[in-house]
Amino acid sequence: MLETRKPAGELFRLGRKPDPWQPPDWSRANPDGTFGNRFDDPQGRYRVLYASSQRISCFVETLARFRPDLTLLAELAQIDGEDDFFPMGKVPRDWCDRRLLGVASADVEHADIYASGWIALLRTKLADECLRLGIADLDAGFLQVAPRRITQLASRQAYERSCPGIYYRSRYGHDFDNWAIFEPFPIIPVSSTAIASGDADLTEALKILRVELSGT
């Protein structure tokens, strides 16, 4: 039997106002039918909502794109002298104003596609596509950093087996448990709240990522 995981508690999601659990409109889809995200449907038939078990994970996942460029960090590391300067990425000041933090329950089993049974299945089902892309092998380590095409095809494999979504650990830290929830979204929204600039989890996420709100 293929491995599954169920959320141990409520799920959190950062989304745009007025409803953080509203999926993106199909009009915003890319020409390939996806929205460019990790577990989107490669056939463009179902949409996916991304949520986290940890409130702070929502901030880390969403704000990671504002981190300082890795090339810049490498160049700074080569400069002689006191290591007392670290360039901070800048988050637009209105970032908080345009979003809400939603809370929902999702008491259903999700595909744990990084578990051994799923890896064995995906290695077989996605073999042709892996070879076409020049990928020599597929294992859990590779799937963690695999091209979008591969993770999206893995999503389709889970969907075709009637899984309501996927459990996965964050690329930014395996202490963050994330969930890709397939349409028709088996969730029960509980609440949604505005994000204060002094929010404790937001502040900690900014610290982890070495970014800051513009104007602070």
Feature map (PLM): residue ranges:
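Extended catalytic/binding region for NAD+/ADP-ribose chemistry, centered on the ART fold
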Residues: G36-L73
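Active-site and NAD+-binding cores of ADP-ribose-processing enzymes
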Residues: M1-R38, T71-T216
